[in-house]
Amino acid sequence: MKNNLYSVYNDSNNVSFLYDNFCYTKKEIDTKIALLEQNFCKLLNNNIENKRVYLDIKDRFLFLISFFTMKKLNLATVLIPIEIQPQLFFEPGIIYISDNKHHDNGIFLTPDFNLVPEKDFNAENIKDFENIYDLYFFTSGSTGKSKNIGKWSSNILTELAELQKLFSIKKGDVFLCIPPIYHIYGFLFTMLPIFSSATIDLNSFFTPESIADYIVNSKIDYLVAVPSYYGLFDKLNLIECFSKLKGAFSSSGPLPGEISKKFFDKNIKIHEIYGSTETGGMAYRIYAKNPNYELIDYVNVKNYHPTEELELFISSPAISVEYDKEVGYCTGDIVKFIDERHFTLLGRNTRFVKIHGKRIDLGFISANFINYLKDTHAIILGENEIFVGCKDENIYLLAECKDKLNTIQISKDLRKILPGYAIPKRILQTKIPRNEMGKINKVAIEA
């Protein structure tokens, strides 16, 4: 019975890791974990209870061995995105382990699982923490202030069990997961094959072409990627390369419907998972079959109404933050219900600003701009190809569009659609900054 995050690995019978042209069996993985455990306990003088470990690990194989070692020792673990510099999160008393950065008070992890203390590391300075959660995801702050978001083992295990059942994952299935493991989406879909006694391919790829070529020449049953990658596969005419997959998954943002349909036409079903770090997975869909989302079985809606557009409130055992169980957790998403288990996702309710005392929803501007391009110029832009922001009470709009836009004419036309104070002062046709998951990086834009 799996009851903690180490048991995800330890209780799985036929799990294996594919890495660097080698297949590691459970017995071989156990040996690596035991070696790292021994080195870690020796370095810390066996004083590890109530400690907190920050893992900043780039190599996927090292990452998983390190993670399961820390969970075997029952240590609260913080997963750090490799693009984040230590000064953003480092605090005295933590245990910081990295294979790609050096910090004077940290520990460097080598490929052979040696732990090398940096020049100012002192095991006596490691302090105890009140670790409320078993696992923390450090968010980089692409949509706000950087922070740790905690999860209990039960949150993760609930979701893994449901995903395994929902998608009928079998022993022997092989997963290739492109998103980084330190992101909740990448983490869950790296844990899913391990939870299911299947195989996770830990090889890394840096171009869409290399991913497609690898899948053509390897046994891969499930691909896990983000919308931007699926868009590139389409743009580069690579969709045929994925025809032998049993299935594919997408998350971290909406997948454009036309992309879903193009893959579906080649008998490739892309399952979109809708959720967040705080809530876990909430719903799923295959857009090409049905553009509406279906709630995952463990999710209950607290404010169902058959006709109104409203903010979605839910209860779920995958939610890790405190919330009123009677009222439900406010997701911040605006939906319209089809029935009690299906809904259309309309947008977010989190982007209101005031312009000269008047309140305006930036999402309203974005939606009208997208509709205008579609209706007037037959140009299709997805939600992830436009960003509307506000600085010093001036609205600005960024658009990623291959068609040349006449921004002067567009500004004139928008005056017929939007109130004067909501007209963007600047419309720029440009590449929009994104993070590793393909999400729009609002901090980079507004810097």
Q: Model-predicted segments: where are they?
A:
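Gly/Ser/Thr-rich phosphate-binding loop
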Residues: Y222, D234-N290
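AMP-binding/adenylate-forming core of the ANL superfamily
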Residues: N300-G328, I334-K336, L398-E400
